Amino acid sequence: MLEVKNLSVSYGAIEAVKDISFTVNAGEIVSLIGANGAGKTTTLHTITGLVPAKSGSVMYNGVDLLKTHNNKIVTLGMAHIPEGRHVFTRMSVEENLEMGAFSLKDQSDLKKDLDMVYGLFPRLKERRNQKAGTLSGGEQQMLAMGRALMSHPKTILMDEPSMGLSPKLVKEIFSIIRKLHEQGITILLVEQNAKMALSIADRAYVLETGRITMEGDAKELLNN
């Protein structure tokens, strides 16, 4: 489904990602773990066209993403939940969710899609008319996830969903990630919280200073 091959990314003279290769197969949760500054977010930004690659390839269901404009990538069935949530703070919860459906040609199922998201995140339904900027960090993370689901993704790239959340909320968010996986959504999960990420992933890659240093079955890495 997603194949990253010999990918290198630089910011000027600084090499952020150094010749990494990994795959995400349909139906998997694959985790990319590592410390802050390891190159995890840069990797996601390159996959989704926000940062140019220096070399390498990124193929998604036969499409070369490095040659695809970033506003077209969502139409291929890929959604990106960025680090820090990035909700539209002055818009209501429901308006934020509706923004997630902007790429869909057929808007006739909008209400059904909203009901689906509200079923997963009852708190968002309670706050649907509330400004997104007034939500807690956990609620904003739920909103970012719900907004991504509105585009009917086959694959979701999640960047640090646990960042800034209490342990209780982290468990809640990861429980929802499991539910999304059970619905058949493929997930590439970037996390500093290695224990939580490995506990739900099928496979994982460890990124250190821009290079993949370990890879394998998530449970085996968890016990390493």
Language model features with spans:
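Glycine-rich phosphate-binding loops of nucleotide-dependent enzymes
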Residues: 1-224
